Amino acid sequence: MAAAPVAAGSGAGRGRRSAATVAAWGGWGGRPRPGNILLQLRQGQLTGRGLVRAVQFTETFLTERDKQSKWSGIPQLLLKLHTTSHLHSDFVECQNILKEISPLLSMEAMAFVTEERKLTQETTYPNTYIFDLFGGVDLLVEILMRPTISIRGQKLKISDEMSKDCLSILYNTCVCTEGVTKRLAEKNDFVIFLFTLMTSKKTFLQTATLIEDILGVKKEMIRLDEVPNLSSLVSNFDQQQLANFCRILAVTISEMDTGNDDKHTLLAKNAQQKKSLSLGPSAAEINQAALLSIPGFVERLCKLATRKVSESTGTASFLQELEEWYTWLDNALVLDALMRVANEESEHNQASIVFPPPGASEENGLPHTSARTQLPQSMKIMHEIMYKLEVLYVLCVLLMGRQRNQVHRMIAEFKLIPGLNNLFDKLIWRKHSASALVLHGHNQNCDCSPDITLKIQFLRLLQSFSDHHENKYLLLNNQELNELSAISLKANIPEVEAVLNTDRSLVCDGKRGLLTRLLQVMKKEPAESSFRFWQARAVESFLRGTTSYADQMFLLKRGLLEHILYCIVDSECKSRDVLQSYFDLLGELMKFNVDAFKRFNKYINTDAKFQVFLKQINSSLVDSNMLVRCVTLSLDRFENQVDMKVAEVLSECRLLAYISQVPTQMSFLFRLINIIHVQTLTQENVSCLNTSLVILMLARRKERLPLYLRLLQRMEHSKKYPGFLLNNFHNLLRFWQQHYLHKDKDSTCLENSSCISFSYWKETVSILLNPDRQSPSALVSYIEEPYMDIDRDFTEE
């Protein structure tokens, strides 16, 4: 329940299994002897031939060998289990044997997960390894799937208790023995069958955790539309089950290759998209559609995401779930952390948790809520945080999917945004307590901490929600919407249509909207905080799209520009990611806004400060080029306006004066083209290409395009590499045509952000790529024949 969304699907032990295998095989003290029984079993497991199961040996033989090898009697138990689990068995004896096997594996797995990998001196091999080698995993799969077999028209049944034992043993083996999870993942019919076991509350948690671990290593994504009665299954989940189910959904609705989306080359992504078009919707897209077709699914997620701590499940129910965790190892670390929190707070609050003894039956229930079973408040909060992590992740992925507009409508209708606003101070951005939950092996500032992960997931959701969508105004309250209208009225400009169309019953309530709350915590964030990047991205997404003067002024009035400049100039920020996000935000905030440039000049009021600012810009144009683009566009607009206020800013602003110089523009242009190549273009650095195009489009408007190309040629020659820059630019523009002429969304974004029609973008690129060497605006006119290299094939190898 508490896994970070960015790592959804990763099992507790998966990253450590190689160590267990080393420990197991190292027990021979060298290369195994020919004829060694374990080696033969291992070969049989790999080939499917020869020795593969305990049933192929006599009990006498296994007992004798066990005395020498100390296998804890596991092979003999598997032999008995096979005998007592036939189709006509009543499974009573079978269940008794499972209860003998379970503790032999569970303690070993618990030690493995908690990194206390101390194999007892009596055993040479881990019990889980022996269990798997003698066919235990395959046998349990068969037992679990017996209900799918019909005899004389009647389906077999096994008890929930027996299913729980089988699932626990399977999971423990997956944790400790390398390769078991992958083998289970290859059994697609078994994976689909596991979903049916989630219909029972008694087996839900074990099943969900095993499925999550299996899906995390499955090469091909499972299709949810193959799960029998998916809609009924999900609709019958209670809220706790639905929150846990979101862990599985995180693996099934996310595209498998999106981990480092900005780092993948556009060539590779374009090739993948072409391939995808021929194959139809991806499994992730099919799964998203399947979920959205379930009645009430998104509404329930919104309720879970916005549920207050006081509304969450009662203590007894939570205790029961924790008892499950006690033997369910994927959550052992979380349980360990929760118990530490409880112990710390009990010293101050005299409140503690009392678990029933391990053997207590479910029928007897758990102790009633009393002074001894009251949960500390911080524990309740952590419980809720771990749920919300998964839910917010799923909502975020759905918001970025093909059905984005449908999801947007539902999220707005079910009041997700005002609900999150009400939770902001008490849960999402609450102050850290001394006993804030910290996972085993991590510290309080680690990005794996549930507290921190929730904040990042929340910010990612806001970014996805606001990005190029009119619903972004739901982040404000009624008073703030009125403020936007007043700003437009005072400036004598039309009100933003989206503001007028906003349903006031769906906006935030209270004294401050969600955007204002975000600005407040953003300005208080420490310089080294990892949240700065995500906060800036979330606020920038509110400004993206067609530039809105009212939106900019709303943020300027709250001191956002001064905060950004402080971070860039005065805080000595070193993080490239944070600087890039702040440069991007500053560009959107200042674009075409005279008041913003006045505020900039007021803050950057000395040459020393301005030089620090320029140093930050010039240190990495990949990070700062969006700001360069916005200032260049603003300068062009201001120069064409007849207004005293604009004229005053043009004459006083250091930044505008700096950008207006042709040598400055040429320096930026040369470096922007030089730092990118077709083979290295990514979603992150393709903006450098578009910024260079903006500079040349504005030059073309002023009939200065030939001058700029001639200057680029001279700069090339001064570097003693004639043709290297213009050939590269020619190839980049050829790729630009291939990439953008088939991308409706991307082209719309270019048009909206620059206020230059996309047709003008296309015309300018065509003019630059004109093959006529007599054209003064064609790149080939400035590349000398011996250095011409413009027909390079940039197909992804």
From Swiss-Prot:
Pathway: Protein modification; protein ubiquitination. It is found in: Cytoplasm, Perinuclear region. One of its GO terms (molecular function) is calcium channel activity. InterPro entries: ARM-type_fold (IPR016024), TRPC4AP (IPR022162). The modification N-acetylalanine is found at A2. GO terms for cellular component: Cul4-RING E3 ubiquitin ligase complex; Cul4A-RING E3 ubiquitin ligase complex; cytosol; perinuclear region of cytoplasm; plasma membrane. Residues 2-400 are annotated as: Interaction with TNFRSF1A. Keywords: Acetylation, Cytoplasm, Host-virus interaction, Phosphoprotein, Ubl conjugation, Ubl conjugation pathway. Its main location: cytoplasm. GO terms for biological process: calcium ion transmembrane transport; hair follicle maturation; protein ubiquitination; ubiquitin-dependent protein catabolic process; ubiquitin-dependent protein catabolic process via the C-end degron rule pathway. Pfam families: DUF3689 (PF12463). The keyword Transferase does not apply. SUPFAM superfamilies: ARM repeat. Phosphorylated by GSK3B; phosphorylation is required for ubiquitination. Substrate-recognition component of a DCX (DDB1-CUL4-X-box) E3 ubiquitin-protein ligase complex required for cell cycle control. The DCX(TRPC4AP) complex specifically mediates the polyubiquitination and subsequent degradation of MYC as part of the DesCEND (destruction via C-end degrons) pathway. The DesCEND (destruction via C-end degrons) pathway recognizes a C-degron located at the extreme C terminus of target proteins, leading to their ubiquitination and degradation. Component of the DCX(TRPC4AP) E3 ubiquitin ligase complex, at least composed of CUL4A, DDB1, TRPC4AP/TRUSS and RBX1. Interacts with MYC. Constitutively associated with TNFRSF1A. Directly interacts with TRADD, TRAF2, CHUK, IKBKB and IKBKG. Interacts with TRPC1, TRPC4 and TRPC5. (Microbial infection) Interacts with Hepatitis B virus (HBV) protein X; leading to prevent ubiquitination of TRPC4AP by SKP2. This is Short transient receptor potential channel 4-associated protein. It comes from Homo sapiens (Human).
